Amino acid sequence: MNRKKNLRLTGAIALVSVAVTLAGCGRDDESSGGARGGSAGITDSTVTLGITTPLSGATAGPGTCTVAGIKAYFGGVNAAGGVKFGDGKTRKVEMKALDDAYDPQKAKSNYDQLKGSVFAMTAGLGTPTNRAFREAAISDEVPQVLVMTGDPIFSDTSESPEQLGFVPTYINEGEAFGKLLVASGQPHKVAILSQNDDYGEGYVEGFKKAIAGASNIQVAKELTYEATDTSVDAQITQLAGTGADVMFNAMSITPLAIASLQKAQQLDWKPSWFLPSNTSSPKAILEPGKASAYPGVYSVSFSKAPQSPAFAGDQDVTTFLSDLKQYADYPDPPAFPHCMWSYMIGATLQEVFQNMEEPTRESFMESLRNVSDLQAPLMLEGTAVNTTEDGQPAVSTVIVQKYNGKGYETAENFG
């Protein structure tokens, strides 16, 4: 398999709290668990990472995937002996993952519980949940990195010195689809439904940036919903009344995404759809939403999709699925892309560990911000991990794709 910088394509460790025998002596100003002269959560033989993510509730599917993917990656790495760090020590990677049910208060509580025993927080899903402890992590100088939120604040070093996002920003995604639509040269009327928070606002901002000044694109109507809403039928009904031929649906809640697709069909409104990368799963959303009824469903991606015929037999995908089954007890092809994303996060962390010269959070952050053109496993051609550009997450390039009834394929044009 083609990999850069000799990363192992294999998987992880414990899903929830792991009992760890700590070695070495912690510094007086650090919590227990530090290596000699190092930071909390790292010894001469182990490094412990913390994750707070939804493992129950409406976003449990994606949240469970955030743990499974990184667990799968480091499972294989640990089985092979661990990661050789830049300080010459070989360490195994352990994790403590707690359920926040997509509740910001629970996420903050989880962070407070974990911060004294982990080296860094990573991979957690959600904008409101990650925001809930961002300021505390800065104050405590605990890295909160490679998190699954497209909120650009996590990639701005002046505002978030201890943070870095992993997935493309919401603005990146919305702009990519807008550019494709403008490039069609055909007139399009667009209906917009967005989540009434930073998530939805980011997608709409990127989309409007791309269509600014384009004479062929008209926004017919724009509505919002709350992340706590249990139905968006009223909004879909209003938007259907516009007769728009494109539906831009900036939605993060899986049940609502399915219901939106279903409701539009009940109203006999069949526009082309745009869905965000985290709510565009063929198996979990498009199939139950009967998305094949629409002339086109578009999303963006930077990862290979195991269900797609285009990647049947792909070595990255084959190894990934094997690791998921063996090390994460996840036997089926994942319904959510978060499994692939967190697998990539594992590979990125391995690269960072290999280049950090001291067992400290400071050395970790320095190494983290110097990853360039890393071809992590499962990345689509044309994408890479690059952490050197301030204001951008680790992955900032996306490929617009179109649903073909089974999976996605690259959309060269709209239509």
Locations of regions flagged by a protein language model:
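Beta-alpha junction/loop-to-helix N-cap segments that form part of ligand/metal-binding clefts
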Residues: 5, 32-37, 61-68, 83-157, ...
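C-terminal motif of bacterial Sec signal peptides marking the signal peptidase cleavage site
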Residues: 21-24
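Bacterial signal peptide processing site
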Residues: 26-28
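Extracytoplasmic "Venus flytrap"
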Residues: 34-45, 50-73, 98-104, 126, ...
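Extracytoplasmic ligand/sensor domains, especially the bilobed periplasmic-binding protein
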Residues: 105, 118-223, 274-299
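Extracellular/periplasmic ligand-binding modules, especially the Venus flytrap/periplasmic-binding
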Residues: 205-206, 253-257, 306-371
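Extracellular/periplasmic bilobal clamshell ligand-binding domains
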Residues: 232, 344-415
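Extracellular/periplasmic periplasmic-binding protein-like sensory domains
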Residues: 264-342, 409
